[in-house]
A protein has these predicted regions:
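N-terminal secretory signal peptides that target proteins for export/translocation
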Residues: 1-9
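Feature targets compositionally biased, intrinsically disordered low-complexity regions
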Residues: 7, 14-17, 39, 171
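Compositionally biased, intrinsically disordered low-complexity regions
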Residues: 10, 17-20, 42, 64
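Bacterial N-terminal signal peptides
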Residues: 15-29
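Extracytoplasmic metal-acquisition and chelation regions
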Residues: 29-316
């Protein structure tokens, strides 16, 4: 599986983005429905706004797709991402786009609107799952039901773009679905062994997974939302979070290892002093070495080790 990482040389100011997209919009109708590879095999140009979606596209489409991932760096804060000229170019040329929605990757909507194409199929995961626009947690890939739905939708879209390979894409989606079984088993085992395990977090990056395993997140939603949105939590919220560690009310502390600041460092220090294991969750799929399935299994096993053996995992 090969997924191209799109890295812009520099952030593109809003005005310049509009100018570039205006040019792209004129050129867009000339893009062919399929791209020829060096071997002569025609491949569909596809884009995943996030690396995890690009990875799933690649698994479904196999040799018939050329996939690019936009947000793909597990060492940066995805909330600070800015589109570069290269990003606009790649998205404008795509025939299939998978994006998260819920405002997480709104730059994609701007690019698509400025470079419309009747050939492009856009899968907005928020809309695919029927979620309202005011849904509070955009980290949809941690929800076990998300990627099977994405895989089916990707297979259908690819089948429309290349009808001759529709059966191949359907088989890819079915294989992907089966490959999630070890993760779902790990979730079920964790839920059965540690029902309602009390945990604390910095933000909701892994909240869907915590819900799936039946854990009780005692961190106030206000603190999670403030941290996610780059807002300083109130002193009352911080004091309550501190008490979760000092009074040993939680068994694990989970934090977003891509977004750490002095407050996160303070929580980590408190957890360590009180003997509470910590788990660093990734907001972006770590690469190389992982696909979506192995990433989710690794995160789930990190939580299991923390609960069962009091072992911390801060890096995959």
């Amino acid at each position: 599986l090969s997924v191209k990482r799109v890295v812009g040389s520099s952030p593109l100011p809003l005005g310049a983005l509009g100018l570039l997209l205006a040019v792209a919009a004129v050129a867009a109708p000339t893009f062919p429905a399929l791209a020829a590879s060096a071997t002569g095999t025609h491949r569909i140009l596809a884009v995943g706004a996030e690396d995890e979606y690009a990875n799933v596209i690649g698994q479904i489409g196999g040799r018939y797709v050329q996939v690019s991932a936009i947000m793909n760096n597990p060492n940066t804060d995805p909330h600070t991402f800015e589109a570069s000229p290269r990003v606009a170019e790649v998205v404008s040329a795509a025939q299939l786009v998978v994006q998260n929605g819920l405002g997480y990757d709104s730059f994609m909507n701007q690019i698509e609107a400025a470079s419309p194409s009747r050939l492009r199929k856009v899968i907005d995961v928020q809309k695919l799952l029927g979620l309202p626009s005011n849904s509070s947690n955009p980290h949809l890939w941690y929800q076990p039901a998300t990627m099977p739905a994405v895989a089916r939708s990707v297979a259908a879209a690819l089948g429309q773009l290349a009808p001759g390979h529709a059966a191949y894409f359907r088989a890819g989606a079915a294989s992907f679905d089966r490959s999630l079984a070890p993760w779902l088993t790990a979730i079920a085992q964790l839920r059965a062994r540690f029902p309602h395990a009390p945990v604390a977090t910095t933000e909701p990056v892994g909240d869907y997974l915590l819900e799936a395993v039946g854990a009780d997140n005692l961190t106030p939603w206000a603190l999670q939302a403030d941290t996610m949105n780059g807002v300083d939590p109130s002193p009352q919220e911080v004091s309550f979070q501190d008490s979760l560690f000092n009074r040993h009310r939680v068994r694990v502390f989970l934090y977003n290892r891509q977004v750490t600041d002095s407050l996160t460092a303070s929580f980590l220090s408190l957890a360590e002093r009180n003997g509470i294991p910590v788990v660093g969750l990734y907001e972006t799929m770590p690469t190389p070495g992982y696909d979506y399935q192995s990433w989710m299994i690794a995160e789930t096993r990190s939580l299991a080790r923390a609960l069962a053996d009091r072992r911390s995992t801060t890096r995959l």
